[in-house]
Amino acid sequence: MAILIKNKVPTTLYQVYDNEGKLMDPNHKITLSNEQLKHAFYLMNLSRIMDKKMLVWQRAGKMLNFAPNLGEEALQVGMGMGLNENDWFCPTFRSGALMLYRGVKPEQLLLYWNGNENGSKIEAKYKTLPINITIGAQYSHAAGLGYMLHYKKLPNVAVTMIGDGGTAEGEFYEAMNIASIHKWNSVFCINNNQFAISTRTKLESAVSDLSTKAIAVNIPRIRVDGNDLIASYEAMHEAANYARSGNGPVLIEFFSWRQGPHTTSDDPSIYRTKEEEAEAMKSDPVKRLRNFLFDRGILTPQQEEEMVAKIEQEVQAAYEVMVSKTPVTLDEVFDYNYEKLTPDLARQKAEAKKYFKD
């Protein structure tokens, strides 16, 4: 398989199966096992059911504002499947499905989005940084970790993603440029869900093919159907192997559709039509993978029903953990990262204690 593009020819959108779950090329060799595919389907459903329940809880005042992953489950789980356990992931705020794949527990994501810093205490073995809200900063994190891996001659990569709107940020270019110059072990990804909050791609970028932004920094690129789990896996697998082999970074654009709001404070009905949404849902990633699994006899409707019931219980249990956790103390907010506070942080801590006491 060779899907990396290294020159200025038009980028083709890489796909493995269509909306009905049929292979685009009947001779295409699937390298994932049936168990891996079923596990991927489980995680995609876990992410989706969590998001739907979180939306209900948030509307009922039982959770704070959050960014749903609806419609982007396949690209995130596919990314995770293409990585090794010792590869690093630098999340953005819409990375829930991939974080679940990496081993982060559902209750940690719920805690994070409910304002409890315990949600950011991710075990070191998962090689996953805390969620990053500042758009673009995660690209610098992935470049820096890629530098570390390159410097130590480790056969691993650092991976991150950004939304289509985030490609207008300076750090998007700066991180790729320095990683390209020094051939660091980084894989940069774009989750092109076609909306930067309410702004369409054509109003935020002069090119509709965002993967071509790789040309300016002289790195190879892949443009992949982000609603196709297997295509997303194969794209990440190839890009990661390229970067871990000392060839330098790769840029992957996952073309998708954001089904839900940007965050729960957003109303998509203001800037897109029901007809657009209905058309986009024909390529729903969960439905497409279900069709693929059913068509090949890997999963049955009864097995799916049992899976969903199990997930419903798992998510409810995670919610119960979330509500049982008390918020962290002010001391812990400041003391968690440092053995000894810097003078600036010590001053800020004293100011915070006075403020909250008053």
From Swiss-Prot:
The pyruvate dehydrogenase complex catalyzes the overall conversion of pyruvate to acetyl-CoA and CO(2). It contains multiple copies of three enzymatic components: pyruvate dehydrogenase (E1), dihydrolipoamide acetyltransferase (E2) and lipoamide dehydrogenase (E3). GO terms for biological process: branched-chain amino acid catabolic process. It holds the Pfam family E1_dh. The keyword Electron transport does not apply. GO terms for molecular function: pyruvate dehydrogenase (acetyl-transferring) activity. Keywords: Oxidoreductase, Pyruvate, Thiamine pyrophosphate. NCBIfam families: PDH_E1_alph_x. It catalyses: N(6)-[(R)-lipoyl]-L-lysyl-[protein] + pyruvate + H(+) = N(6)-[(R)-S(8)-acetyldihydrolipoyl]-L-lysyl-[protein] + CO2. The gene is pdhA. GO terms for cellular component: cell surface; cytosol; membrane. InterPro entries: Alpha-ketoacid_DH_E1_comp, DH_E1, PdhA/BkdA, THDP-binding. The keyword Ubl conjugation does not apply. This is Pyruvate dehydrogenase E1 component subunit alpha. It comes from Mycoplasma pneumoniae (strain ATCC 29342 / M129 / Subtype 1). Its cofactor is thiamine diphosphate. Heterodimer of an alpha and a beta chain. Its EC number is 1.2.4.1.
